[in-house]
Protein backbone atom coordinates (compact mmCIF):
# COMPACT_ATOMS: atom_id res chain seq x y z
CA UNK A 1 0.00 0.00 0.00
CA UNK A 2 2.80 2.46 0.86
CA UNK A 3 5.38 1.69 -1.79
CA UNK A 4 6.98 5.13 -2.12
CA UNK A 5 8.10 6.58 1.20
CA UNK A 6 9.40 10.08 1.88
CA UNK A 7 11.69 10.67 4.86
CA UNK A 8 12.36 14.34 5.61
CA UNK A 9 15.70 14.78 7.40
CA UNK A 10 17.24 17.88 8.94
CA UNK A 11 20.52 16.38 10.12
CA UNK A 12 19.36 15.76 13.67
CA UNK A 13 19.43 12.50 15.58
CA UNK A 14 15.73 12.97 16.24
CA UNK A 15 14.90 13.11 12.52
CA UNK A 16 16.90 9.95 11.89
CA UNK A 17 14.69 8.01 14.34
CA UNK A 18 12.28 7.62 11.42
CA UNK A 19 14.87 5.58 9.51
CA UNK A 20 14.54 2.61 11.88
CA UNK A 21 10.91 2.19 10.89
CA UNK A 22 11.54 2.84 7.21
CA UNK A 23 14.24 0.15 7.16
CA UNK A 24 11.78 -2.33 8.66
CA UNK A 25 9.11 -1.35 6.13
CA UNK A 26 11.52 -1.99 3.25
CA UNK A 27 12.88 -5.24 4.69
CA UNK A 28 9.36 -6.58 5.25
CA UNK A 29 8.19 -5.57 1.78
CA UNK A 30 5.87 -2.74 2.80
CA UNK A 31 7.93 -0.09 1.02
CA UNK A 32 9.89 -0.30 -2.23
CA UNK A 33 11.20 3.21 -2.81
CA UNK A 34 12.72 5.51 -0.22
CA UNK A 35 13.34 9.19 -0.83
CA UNK A 36 15.34 11.26 1.63
CA UNK A 37 14.53 14.98 1.56
CA UNK A 38 16.33 17.90 3.13
CA UNK A 39 14.78 21.35 3.09
CA UNK A 40 17.18 24.26 3.42
CA UNK A 41 16.39 27.90 3.99
CA UNK A 42 18.89 30.49 2.85
CA UNK A 43 18.30 33.97 4.14
CA UNK A 44 20.48 37.05 3.94
CA UNK A 45 22.14 37.77 7.28
CA UNK A 46 21.34 40.94 9.18
CA UNK A 47 24.59 42.50 7.93
CA UNK A 48 23.07 42.53 4.44
CA UNK A 49 20.27 44.73 5.73
CA UNK A 50 22.79 47.31 6.84
CA UNK A 51 24.64 47.55 3.54
CA UNK A 52 27.42 45.05 4.11
CA UNK A 53 28.20 43.00 1.02
CA UNK A 54 27.28 39.35 1.28
CA UNK A 55 27.27 36.70 -1.44
CA UNK A 56 23.94 34.94 -0.94
CA UNK A 57 24.65 32.55 -3.83
CA UNK A 58 27.84 31.39 -2.14
CA UNK A 59 25.90 30.80 1.07
CA UNK A 60 23.15 28.95 -0.82
CA UNK A 61 25.72 26.68 -2.47
CA UNK A 62 27.31 25.92 0.91
CA UNK A 63 23.92 25.01 2.42
CA UNK A 64 22.99 22.79 -0.52
CA UNK A 65 26.42 21.13 -0.51
CA UNK A 66 26.25 20.42 3.23
CA UNK A 67 22.72 19.00 3.00
CA UNK A 68 23.66 16.91 -0.05
CA UNK A 69 26.73 15.53 1.70
CA UNK A 70 24.67 14.66 4.76
CA UNK A 71 22.01 12.85 2.69
CA UNK A 72 24.73 10.98 0.76
CA UNK A 73 26.04 9.71 4.09
CA UNK A 74 22.59 8.53 5.12
CA UNK A 75 22.17 6.84 1.72
CA UNK A 76 25.49 5.05 2.20
CA UNK A 77 24.49 3.81 5.66
CA UNK A 78 21.18 2.53 4.31
CA UNK A 79 23.02 0.93 1.40
CA UNK A 80 25.12 -1.17 3.78
CA UNK A 81 21.82 -2.67 4.94
CA UNK A 82 20.68 -3.36 1.39
CA UNK A 83 18.29 -0.41 1.23
CA UNK A 84 18.53 1.83 -1.79
CA UNK A 85 17.37 5.40 -1.36
CA UNK A 86 17.39 8.49 -3.50
CA UNK A 87 17.80 11.96 -2.10
CA UNK A 88 17.00 15.54 -2.89
CA UNK A 89 17.64 18.94 -1.38
CA UNK A 90 15.11 21.72 -1.90
CA UNK A 91 14.97 25.32 -0.73
CA UNK A 92 11.93 26.63 1.09
CA UNK A 93 10.86 28.35 4.27
CA UNK A 94 9.04 27.11 6.24
CA UNK A 95 9.92 23.44 5.60
CA UNK A 96 6.50 21.80 6.12
CA UNK A 97 4.87 23.07 2.89
CA UNK A 98 7.96 22.06 0.93
CA UNK A 99 7.70 18.53 2.31
CA UNK A 100 3.97 18.14 1.66
CA UNK A 101 4.28 19.66 -1.83
CA UNK A 102 7.22 17.41 -2.68
CA UNK A 103 5.28 14.32 -1.61
CA UNK A 104 2.24 15.32 -3.68
CA UNK A 105 4.18 16.33 -6.81
CA UNK A 106 6.27 13.16 -6.81
CA UNK A 107 3.46 10.68 -6.16
CA UNK A 108 4.78 9.49 -2.82
CA UNK A 109 2.52 7.27 -0.73
CA UNK A 110 3.67 8.01 2.81
CA UNK A 111 5.66 10.60 4.74
CA UNK A 112 7.55 9.15 7.70
CA UNK A 113 8.78 11.83 10.09
CA UNK A 114 10.04 11.91 13.65
CA UNK A 115 8.45 14.15 16.26
CA UNK A 116 9.32 15.26 19.77
CA UNK A 117 5.72 14.74 20.80
CA UNK A 118 5.59 18.03 22.67
CA UNK A 119 2.21 19.19 23.89
CA UNK A 120 0.81 22.35 25.39
CA UNK A 121 3.09 25.33 25.90
CA UNK A 122 6.23 23.59 24.61
CA UNK A 123 4.48 22.87 21.30
CA UNK A 124 3.26 26.47 21.04
CA UNK A 125 6.67 27.93 21.85
CA UNK A 126 8.75 25.64 19.68
CA UNK A 127 6.36 25.00 16.81
CA UNK A 128 6.26 21.70 15.04
CA UNK A 129 7.15 20.83 11.47
CA UNK A 130 5.69 17.36 12.00
CA UNK A 131 2.40 18.76 13.27
CA UNK A 132 2.13 21.15 10.34
CA UNK A 133 2.77 18.29 7.92
CA UNK A 134 0.15 16.17 9.67
CA UNK A 135 -2.47 18.92 9.40
CA UNK A 136 -1.79 19.98 5.81
CA UNK A 137 -0.60 16.90 3.92
CA UNK A 138 -2.81 15.07 1.46
CA UNK A 139 -0.29 12.24 1.67
CA UNK A 140 -0.64 9.90 4.68
CA UNK A 141 1.80 10.70 7.49
CA UNK A 142 3.45 8.33 9.98
CA UNK A 143 4.77 10.18 13.05
CA UNK A 144 7.58 8.47 14.95
CA UNK A 145 8.45 9.27 18.56
CA UNK A 146 12.13 8.78 19.47
CA UNK A 147 11.23 6.19 22.10
CA UNK A 148 9.54 4.07 19.43
CA UNK A 149 12.75 3.79 17.41
CA UNK A 150 14.57 2.22 20.35
CA UNK A 151 12.15 -0.67 20.81
Language-model regions, residue ranges each:
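Active-site loop/turn elements of alpha/beta-hydrolase fold enzymes
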Residues: 39, 92, 146
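Small/aliphatic-rich secondary-structure junction motif
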Residues: 1-54, 77-79, 83
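Structural beta-alpha unit
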Residues: 24, 76-111, 151
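Short, structured motif recognition centered on aromatic/hydrophobic residues
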Residues: 7, 34-36, 70, 113-114, ...
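Acidic, proline/glycine-rich short linear motifs
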Residues: 39-69, 150-151
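Short, well-ordered secondary-structure micro-motifs
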Residues: 18, 46-49, 97-100, 123-125
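Gly/Ser-rich helix-loop-strand patches that form or flank binding pockets
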Residues: 104-151
Amino acid sequence: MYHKVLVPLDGSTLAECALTHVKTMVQEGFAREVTLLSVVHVDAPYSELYGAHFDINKMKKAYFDAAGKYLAGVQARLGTEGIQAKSEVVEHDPPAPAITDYAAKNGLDLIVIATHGYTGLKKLMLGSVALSILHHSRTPVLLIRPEASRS
